Structure formats: C-alpha cells, structure tokens
Amino acid sequence: MEKKCYEVKFTESAEKDLKKLNKSIAKLLKKWISENLIGTQNPKQRGKALTGNLKGLWRYRVGSYRIVAEIKNDILLILIIEISDRKETYKDKKRKTYKKK
C-alpha cells in the first residue's frame, strides 16, 4: 500500500513574509520546511493546533519564528499562511483573521 505524503504551498502573503526576512533566516526556515513538512505523512506531529479565532490552523515553531498553516487532509496539502517572529504572530491575535479557502 502506497503511503500518502503531504505537499506544501505558500499563500501570497506568506511568500511576502519570507521575502521580508533576513536572507539567512529565510534560508533556515525554507530548510526546516523542506526537511520537516514537504513529503511528511503526518504534518500534525511537529505542529500545534491553534485555538480561539485561529482554531483550525496549526503552528510550527522554528526558533523564535512561527509558521502558521492550514492542513487540508482531503487533498494532502499544508498551506502556509504566515511566517513571522513569535512576537508579531501573536501580537494582535484577537484582531487577526485568516480567510479560509
């Protein structure tokens, strides 16, 4: 039986977040995503489910940076929504909303 592996895609805003970062940090985050998320069979293993108005989303911790993603099990996709420093990710948590696709 063939094992199912997840694919990773970035939203436009996540791509912009990555471009805003220092090149060495962006490289580190891309490497982490490549090694830990691309091709994984269980994306929830390394992440943590978010709660409140971010319920349904997952976060991955890479040093002081956070990757916020939506896991779409039906199509085996990890959609990265935001990449930012921990302080920025949770600063306006009550006001922050993500459009579910």
Name these PLM-found stretches:
Residues 8-9, 59:
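Short aromatic/basic micro-patch
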Residues 9-42:
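N-terminal first-folded block
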Residues 23, 52, 56, 78-81:
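Generic detector of low-complexity/intrinsically disordered segments
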Residues 13, 55, 85:
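Residues that form or immediately flank small-molecule/cofactor binding pockets and catalytic motifs
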Residues 34-59:
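A short, surface-exposed loop/turn module that caps and links secondary-structure elements
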Residues 4-5, 23-26, 47-50:
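Short, mixed-charge, low-aromatic patches
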Residues 1, 5, 16, 27, ...:
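Enriched for short, Lys/Arg-rich terminal
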